[in-house]
């Protein structure tokens, strides 16, 4: 088979197709360039914008005020496990020993 011309590279999903030899795929490592990261950082800086204002939240028709309505201590009490009023003891089990037949 002839190799593709150097000027025109056929790509699949943004990368060159896999090379096979003897039915097995051969991994080809390509060195990465640092230019793409710098360009990406520049793009991020250009598109950065301040976060949009948070919308007001209504709970049952009243404006919620965040932690003022639900203090962290109240939430902590709601998530604590209730203590049992009586201690539970395991029921006594009869012990059965498996023995071979005669």
UniProtKB/Swiss-Prot annotation:
InterPro entries: DAP1/DAPL1. This is Death-associated protein 1. Residues 1-102 are annotated as: Disordered. The modification N6-acetyllysine is found at residue 29. Phosphorylated. Phosphorylation by MTOR inhibits the suppressive activity of DAP toward autophagy. Belongs to the DAP-DAPL1 family. It comes from Homo sapiens. PANTHER family: DEATH-ASSOCIATED PROTEIN 1. Residues 92-102 have a biased composition (Polar residues). One of its GO terms (biological process) is apoptotic process. The lineage of its organism: Eukaryota, Metazoa, Chordata, Craniata, Vertebrata.
């Amino acid at each position: 088979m002839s190799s593709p011309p150097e000027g025109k590279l056929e790509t699949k999903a943004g990368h060159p197709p896999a090379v096979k030899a003897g039915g097995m795929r051969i991994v080809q490592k390509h060195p990465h360039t640092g230019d793409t990261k710098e360009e990406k950082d520049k793009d991020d800086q250009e598109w950065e914008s301040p976060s949009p204002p948070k919308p007001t939240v209504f709970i049952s028709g009243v404006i919620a005020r965040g932690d003022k309505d639900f203090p962290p201590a109240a939430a902590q009490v709601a998530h604590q496990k209730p203590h049992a009023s009586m201690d539970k003891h395991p029921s006594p089990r009869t012990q059965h020993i498996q023995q071979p037949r005669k």
